[in-house]
């Protein structure tokens, strides 16, 4: 890490500033606070200032050429969303246009900024992973505090509907998203020492389980199963012992925790917590405006929306259905093309660790998080999309 602070043998103010901003942005992804808002704006401004000061227009042009497919799809997606907003002013949310602008700045320009500074060798993949672990570590401290002060109400409670770990966040599903991501990140990013790897996996798995986020459970299980199958030959006895120990812990928790047993039973019984009602409604409404949809944030303002009778049904809870509702089939095509391109890039460059993390996010977003307004999941997806393209960029 220290090498990135220097340029031509001397400390570089540009590099130190960038790494500080990158650390703040990566770490603040896991918290709903002003630091994230400030850091993503500062990162964008720093990118613009560096570009103009050093006149690195050729580097930016080269990056755009190497990422032209995903860039064109992103522009077309935003254009589709903007047209949909214009055609549906009566039902879009009050912050629809602001959210559309932030969609560009938080994800589009940040993606370019990461590619730009990576091309200049300001940081590497390990730095990104380290900064993400910093944020996850801080969040974990708040989870431990909640767990210590409310163990009976969470682990040994008989009410799994209102319980669950949330840490410093307001929502257990968001914590589940982060802890599941931390679990997968620990599996693919921590190589040595194994004691640190296993400790991180244990903590993130425990926190994920008691967030009671079933989407995170399913996503992490599928992603780690995929990663394990790819690395069967490299797994030794220590990994086998850890797996056996984890299964034993799982069985003990199942026996001792009524709330965990309830959530697991709900998962296997197919209890959707109202999601099937939401999804059926979206599919029905999408048939009326299939091409461009209803505009950003329109779900809560549409006639007969499930949220009118059930306030807890306040979001589409499915990435693809949200795209279909807000930007129609056209948006679905462009968004799907971006996803396909990123996954293809991972496979071609053999970045199966990044692919594992993408699989986790994609599965989780089929049940809990959306395509346009879920800044937590989308910020992580932006980082992973950059990592998928980094091999192409550095050629």
Question: Where are these predicted regions, by residue range?
Answer:
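N-terminal signal-anchor transmembrane segment
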Residues: 1-55, 77-90, 361-363
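Hydrophobic, aromatic-rich transmembrane alpha-helices
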Residues: 2-5, 41-58, 181-190, 330-348, ...
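Membrane-interface helix-loop-helix junctions at transmembrane boundaries of multi-pass membrane enzymes
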Residues: 4-15, 51-71, 189-199, 231-241, ...
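Transmembrane alpha-helices of multi-pass inner-membrane enzymes
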Residues: 19, 26, 42-50, 354-366, ...
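Aromatic-anchored transmembrane helix interface
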Residues: 72-76, 93-118, 127, 131, ...
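Alpha-helical transmembrane segments of multi-pass inner-membrane proteins
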Residues: 109-112, 126-160, 167-233, 337, ...
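A membrane-periplasm/extracellular boundary helix in multi-pass inner-membrane enzymes
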Residues: 231-270, 283-288, 296
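Long extracytoplasmic/lumenal interhelical loops at the membrane interface
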Residues: 266-280, 284, 288, 292-327
């Amino acid at each position: 890490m220290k090498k990135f602070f220097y340029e031509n043998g001397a400390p570089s103010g540009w590099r130190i500033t960038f790494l500080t901003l990158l650390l703040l942005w990566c770490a603040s992804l896991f918290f709903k606070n002003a630091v994230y808002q400030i850091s993503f704006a500062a990162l964008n401004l720093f990118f613009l200032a560096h570009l103009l000061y050093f006149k690195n227009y050729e580097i930016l042009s080269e990056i755009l050429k190497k990422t032209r497919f995903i860039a064109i799809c992103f522009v077309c997606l935003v254009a589709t969303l903007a047209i949909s907003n214009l055609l549906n002013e009566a039902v879009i949310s009050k912050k629809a246009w602001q959210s559309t602008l932030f969609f560009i700045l938080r994800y589009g320009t940040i993606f370019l900024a990461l590619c730009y500074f990576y091309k200049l060798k300001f940081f590497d993949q390990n730095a990104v992973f380290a900064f993400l672990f910093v944020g996850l570590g801080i969040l974990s401290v708040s989870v431990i505090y909640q767990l210590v002060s409310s163990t009976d109400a969470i682990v040994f409670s008989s009410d799994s509907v209102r319980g669950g770990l949330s840490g410093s966040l307001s929502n257990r599903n968001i914590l589940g998203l982060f802890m599941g991501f931390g679990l997968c990140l620990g599996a693919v990013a921590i190589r040595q020492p194994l004691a640190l790897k296993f400790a991180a996996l244990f903590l993130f798995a425990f926190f994920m389980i008691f967030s009671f986020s079933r989407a995170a459970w399913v996503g992490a299980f599928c992603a780690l199963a995929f990663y394990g199958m790819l690395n069967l030959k490299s797994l030794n006895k220590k990994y086998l012992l850890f797996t056996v120990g984890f299964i034993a812990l799982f069985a003990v928790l199942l026996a001792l925790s009524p709330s965990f047993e309830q959530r697991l039973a709900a998962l296997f019984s197919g209890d959707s917590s109202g999601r099937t009602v939401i999804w059926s409604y979206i599919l029905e409404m999408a048939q009326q405006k299939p091409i461009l949809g209803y505009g950003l944030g329109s779900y809560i303002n549409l006639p007969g929306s499930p949220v009118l009778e059930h306030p807890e049904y306040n979001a589409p809870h499915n990435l693809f259905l949200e795209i279909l509702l807000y930007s129609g089939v056209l948006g679905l095509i462009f968004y799907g093309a971006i996803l396909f391109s990123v996954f293809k890039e991972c496979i071609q460059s053999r970045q199966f660790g990044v692919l594992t993390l993408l699989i986790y996010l994609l599965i989780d977003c089929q049940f809990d998080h959306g395509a346009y307004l879920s800044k937590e999941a989308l910020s992580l997806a932006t980082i992973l999309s950059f990592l998928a393209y980094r091999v192409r960029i550095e050629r």
